[in-house]
């Protein structure tokens, strides 16, 4: 990323007295901006993703399907079924530890990829404290 900007809040201090319970994080890349919103304060748990582009969008409201809009049409698609060990995080970890699979640097569960995630989150905390974007 080029920069990270974040606002962290504590909306329910009586319920979560020691932590921020609401976060909005903007991650700026050369040709895109990602908005991450996370909260323990919402009345309903959410695990959705919305991606907007210049020619359409993708909504993934549930893990089991996504809506793709392009060329003025929306189509619902189902994700492909993953084979073992990729269909279960514990089987995946076991296979990686036993070297039954080769984890690639940009796989979702790779160390390299997750270190980028940690760097983004640490930058979000610094940004929230300073009130300014953290540049990379």
Q: What spans do the regions from the language model cover?
A:
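Active-site loop of classical SDR/Rossmann-like NAD(P)-dependent oxidoreductases
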Residues: 80-92, 109, 116
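Short polybasic amphipathic segments
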Residues: 49, 64-73
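Glycine-centered tight beta-turn/hairpin loop motif at sheet-sheet or coil-to-beta transitions
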Residues: 29-33, 55, 72-73
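A short, sequence-level motif marking secondary-structure junctions
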Residues: 39-43, 63-67, 80-86
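Broad, structure-driven detector of short, well-ordered beta-strand segments within folded domains
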Residues: 56-61
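C-terminal helix-rich "cap/oligomerization" subdomain common to oxidoreductases
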Residues: 95-136
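Short beta-strand segments
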Residues: 34-36, 47, 76, 134
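Rossmann-like dinucleotide-binding domain that binds NAD(P)(H)
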Residues: 1-33, 40-44, 112
